[in-house]
A protein has these predicted regions:
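Generic detector of contiguous secondary-structure segments
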Residues: 24-38, 76-88
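Short coil/linker segments at helix-helix boundaries
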Residues: 20-24, 46-82, 102-132, 146-162
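Amphipathic alpha-helical repeat scaffolds of TPR domains
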Residues: 1-11, 32-62, 88-108, 135-152, ...
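Alpha-helical segment of the N-proximal tetratricopeptide repeat
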Residues: 5-25
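Terminal, non-catalytic domain-edge segments
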Residues: 157-173
Length: 173
């Protein structure tokens, strides 16, 4: 089972209804089924991606993403906190959330200002996931970012085309 399962509803919403609708969909779907790890991952990644793009990416404020930044902050923080408590040892959670925490720990409402500690926590999560799933190319590619032997994802690794899948394809291919 892939870490990011194909999500046709999410892909459709991102294209037809926009980022805010996609964020609301993933967040509400996860709240309705909190113990579903895929729903948790999708809620967290959608919030993280929109937050990152609103601050640093090509979308910028001109596309209205600043209006959903508070929602993103809340959704990402809640998903991360819940995930740490309930899925903290699951390699799928560790790999994806570890990456997001490593890059932008200040996206968390419980971020205490210690960037290095939280970034290292994210790195440790990725490496722990890699130990558990040594043969998973996605997790290996995330872990290899910290070594001289970079691993690239094959172009056809992801089945879907959601924003986060496109992001990871661009970053890891």
């Amino acid at each position: 089972m892939p870490i990011l399962e194909k999500d046709l509803v999410l892909e459709s919403l991102e294209i037809s209804a926009g980022w805010e609708a996609a964020l609301n969909f993933t967040y509400q779907r996860w709240l309705a089924a909190k113990d579903n790890l895929q729903f948790l991952i999708r809620a967290g990644t959608e919030a993280w991606l929109i937050e990152a793009c609103s601050l640093l990416g090509p979308f910028g404020p001109k596309d209205g993403l600043e209006s959903v930044r508070d929602q993103c902050f809340t959704a990402f923080s809640e998903a991360t906190s819940y995930g740490m408590q309930h899925f903290g040892q699951h390699p799928a959670f560790q790999s994806v959330f570890g990456y997001m925490i490593e890059l932008f720990p200040y996206f968390l409402d419980f971020f205490d200002g210690n960037f290095d500690r939280w970034s290292q926590k994210g790195t440790q999560m990725i490496l722990s996931a890699h130990k558990a799933l040594a043969d998973d190319i996605f997790v290996a590619a995330l872990a290899a970012r910290h070594s001289a032997n970079r691993i690239l994802l094959p172009d056809d690794y992801f089945d879907g085309n959601s924003g986060i899948e496109e992001y990871f394809h661009d970053v890891l291919s």
